[in-house]
């Protein structure tokens, strides 16, 4: 690698997450040149020592790719003035910088760091302002020291600002004491990064701090794939493997954690299951509260349900199937009720019937769903306002996890609550929902248990049904009007383990296009998407895929689709986001709930304006002109949405779905994933890839059981329904 020393002449670009910078530099050896740096940019006027290599960018030409960077103290009067005038030190602009340097010359930085009170000698600087300038310079010096420390230990200096904000002046001391605390305290730093710092600092690979952090990491990873608990033997073995240490060492630390009540255990079938405290509490309390609610609510007797239902059928011009009628009555009889069924089986009709009776009885009713898109669909289909579960519970963002305004101390004002898309509920959110439900309120879960389970830990809907202790009605009859749909027919065939029937032609209602080469399949998808949306209706088509990586994964597809649909141009503004770039015209997805902006995880919109680092998005569900603007630091809430994972599509419907199914997705080729993807489409499904991949998914009904004891807890003390 080449070593260079240069002055920062200009900061051309800095990403919102502080992890990428484009700099204009000037040095005696190279003259003026462009450099790119994966980290926080130094300030204009600062002198830096760099190591890196020269690269040739296809669009921007020759650049110096900085691998490591150290800020040097400016030594010349001109360099010091330029640094201060850059805005690096709060309260100092070009005029004040010139006055300070005129007064102190090359001693300026020593004055700032050691004798800031002397700044009051400069015209226009009061004693109070001098103290503020000194404090700002001190923080900046601490930040620079922290950046150097991180770089020395192989960690991007882009984390420095977050570390300083969390730990203040003690950041380096805190990290040295226990680098593994970073994984708990700093968003974006996980166990692996903390472990890399610890190893670079010379910590022993079998020290107790590392083993404790490794166990916590293993439990976090397990929760990330849906488990609320893990068998002790598996937990110890996997932790030892990940840390490359002896299992006996992990077992010793694990036993210590149990003695300190930092983990919880449960015996089941001769197996010791280990829980993190928060998931143990959530699971135990969910079971207790479900059983209590089930038995508390009294049957609805304020109206004659038979008469209300009969009148509603006449007015609506429908005749309920017997299972639908039973479902309505069951919801009125029990405090907790579960309604499940596939597409076309009439779940929406049952919900409308339940609402009709409850409204006639004068009940206070609330409707909710796990995502914003699902809530809007519920509101449209039921003709009743609906919210996300988070909004219903008055979610309050905190750095410590889930926090809600509604709980058992201030419960919801409702006599009946209907939760749609209940298969998406994880155990933590269900627990917080149940905490906010008042005694005597009835709770109705509606969802398709055969779809993918929640992204978070637990299988709440499936476990409630599996327990046999909750009243359940499963709708299985597909109604005649739905039966004519190839999508509905094939969805049920897939769910029964049968291959779907593909119709001839890529423009048919249910088609397959086969490709031997995955990149060819991805290119075909991009061309087809471009043709289908050439009229400008970008909302009609959605590309779905099982995985994020490989040629047919979310990341590559989004880049490819963006290239076809929205390529760069000189007059088209753009802004960087992690792993990609956004341009005016791009289809984007909100990836976390933002209640201040009233946008939710999964909302799809279109970029209509980029002004500097501010991005404005139009979301079609909002009134015309009610746009959402994202400032610097908020843009990372967006990602390209031409393609998305099947998991991310849960709770949504699209007129046209293009689904990638290739053999390299084998680890994800499962029946419930294919079933979930197909049921996202209202009008047409085009599967691109291989028939063998489809067959693999159809035949693979061995969905890995999630470690969870919710069903068993519900069975412990209850009468069977």
Briefly describe each language-model feature range.
Residues 496, 603-721:
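C-terminal accessory regions
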Residues 337-379, 446, 510-517, 531-550:
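Conserved RecA-like ASCE P-loop NTPase motor core of nucleic-acid helicases/translocases
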Residues 449-597, 608:
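Conserved helicase motor core of P-loop NTPases
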């Amino acid at each position: 690698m080449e070593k260079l020393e240069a002055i920062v002449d200009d900061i051309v670009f800095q990403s919102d997450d502080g992890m990428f910078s484009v700099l204009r530099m000037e040095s005696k050896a190279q003259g003026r040149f462009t450099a790119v740096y994966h980290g926080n940019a130094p300030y204009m006027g600062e002198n830096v020592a760099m190591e890196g290599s020269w690269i040739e960018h296809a669009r921007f030409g020759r650049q110096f790719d900085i691998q490591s960077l150290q800020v040097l103290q400016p030594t010349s009067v001109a360099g010091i003035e330029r640094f201060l005038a850059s805005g690096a030190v709060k309260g100092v602009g070009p005029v004040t910088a010139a006055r300070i340097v005129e007064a102190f010359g090359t001693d300026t930085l020593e004055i700032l760091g050691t004798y800031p009170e002397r700044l009051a000698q400069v015209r226009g600087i009061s004693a109070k302002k001098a103290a503020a300038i000194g404090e700002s310079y001190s923080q900046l010096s601490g930040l620079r020291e922290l950046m150097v420390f991180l770089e020395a230990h192989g960690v991007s200096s882009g984390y420095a600002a977050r570390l300083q904000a969390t730990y203040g002046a003690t950041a380096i001391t805190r990290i040295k004491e226990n680098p593994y605390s970073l994984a708990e305290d700093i968003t974006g730093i996980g166990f692996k990064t903390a472990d890399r710092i610890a190893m670079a600092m010379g910590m022993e690979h079998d020290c107790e701090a590392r083993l404790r952090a490794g166990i916590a990491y293993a439990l976090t990873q397990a929760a990330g794939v849906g488990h609320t608990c893990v068998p002790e033997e598996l937990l110890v073995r996997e932790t030892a493997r990940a840390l490359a240490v002896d299992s006996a060492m992990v077992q010793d630390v694990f036993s210590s954690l149990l003695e300190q009540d930092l983990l919880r255990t449960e015996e089941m079938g001769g197996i010791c299951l280990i829980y993190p405290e928060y998931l143990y509490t959530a699971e135990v309390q969910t079971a207790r509260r479900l059983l209590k609610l089930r038995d508390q609510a009294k049957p609805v007797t304020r109206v004659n349900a038979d008469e209300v239902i009969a009148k509603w059928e006449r007015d609506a011009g429908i005749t309920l199937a017997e299972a639908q009628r039973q479902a309505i009555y069951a919801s009125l009889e029990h405090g907790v009720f579960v309604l499940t069924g596939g597409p076309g089986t009439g779940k929406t009709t049952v919900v409308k019937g339940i609402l009709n009776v409850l409204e006639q009885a004068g009940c206070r009713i609330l409707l909710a769903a796990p995502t914003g898109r699902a809530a809007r669909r519920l509101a449209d289909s039921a003709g009743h306002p609906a919210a996300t579960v988070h909004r219903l519970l008055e979610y309050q963002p905190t750095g410590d996890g889930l926090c809600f305004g509604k709980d058992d101390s201030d419960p919801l004002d409702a006599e009946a609550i209907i939760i749609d898309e209940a298969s998406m509920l994880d155990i933590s959110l269900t627990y917080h929902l149940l905490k906010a439900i008042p005694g005597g309120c009835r709770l109705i879960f509606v969802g398709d248990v055969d779809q993918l389970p929640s992204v978070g830990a637990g299988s709440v809907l499936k476990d409630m049904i599996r327990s046999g202790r909750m009243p359940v009605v499963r709708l299985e009859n597909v109604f005649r009007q739905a039966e004519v749909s190839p999508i509905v027919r094939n969805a049920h065939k897939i769910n029964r383990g049968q291959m779907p029937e593909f119709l001839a032609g890529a423009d048919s209602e249910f088609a397959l296009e086969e490709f031997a080469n995955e990149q060819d399949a991805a290119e075909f998808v991009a061309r087809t998407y471009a043709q289908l949306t050439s009229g400008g209706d970008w909302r009609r088509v959605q590309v779905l895929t099982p995985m994020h990586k490989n040629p047919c994964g979310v990341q590559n597809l989004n880049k490819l689709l963006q290239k076809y649909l929205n390529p760069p141009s000189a007059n088209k503004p753009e802004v960087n986001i992690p792993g990609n770039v956004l341009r005016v015209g791009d289809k984007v997805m909100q990836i976390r709930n933002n209640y201040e902006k009233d946008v939710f995880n999964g909302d799809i919109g279109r970029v209509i304006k980029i002004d500097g680092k501010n991005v404005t998005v139009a979301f079609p569900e909002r009134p015309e002109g009610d746009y959402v603007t994202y400032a610097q630091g908020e843009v990372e809430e967006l990602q390209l949405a031409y393609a998305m994972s099947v998991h991310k599509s849960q709770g949504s419907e699209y007129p046209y779905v293009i689904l990638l199914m290739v053999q390299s997705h084998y680890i994800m080729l499962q029946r419930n994933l294919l079933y979930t993807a197909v049921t996202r489409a209202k009008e047409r499904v085009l599967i691109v890839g291989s028939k063998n991949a489809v067959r693999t998914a159809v035949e693979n009904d061995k969905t890995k059981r999630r470690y969870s004891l919710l069903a068993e807890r519900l069975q412990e003390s209850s009468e069977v329904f």
